Amino acid sequence: MSYINKPGKTRAWRKMVSRQQVSDVISHGSIVTTKTKAKESQRHVDHLITLAKKNTLASRRAAAAILLGTNQHSADDLLRKLFNELGPKYANRAGGYTRVIKLGNRPGDNTEEAVLQLV
């Protein structure tokens, strides 16, 4: 789950940030983040929705290993939402469950920002 080779950041940090962003997208439907993190998290969200479409015990366990609880929802709530709402919603779609929309640069450090949202 690492998205860039960022000096000063460990693999564990990159993995946790990616897992948290994936959980936030499933919880809220969209997030605002940097373009690089959005592109990487997009891969993982699309993969989780593909697992939700399969709806097997193995796919539920694989998704549970990735999802983290947020302030509003527990990991179990997110798993239910993924398999009961998002899986059936995208059942007839072959892929491309999310989109990244560029927002421009952040005022503080001039980093490109983007919105990662479910289609």
UniProtKB/Swiss-Prot annotation:
Transmembrane segments: none annotated. It comes from the Bacteria. Keywords: Ribonucleoprotein, Ribosomal protein. GO terms for biological process: translation. Disulfide bonds: none annotated. It holds the Pfam family Ribosomal_L17. One of its GO terms (molecular function) is structural constituent of ribosome. InterPro entries: Ribosomal_bL17, Ribosomal_bL17_CS, Ribosomal_bL17_sf. One of its GO terms (cellular component) is cytosolic large ribosomal subunit. Part of the 50S ribosomal subunit. Contacts protein L32. Belongs to the bacterial ribosomal protein bL17 family. This is Large ribosomal subunit protein bL17.
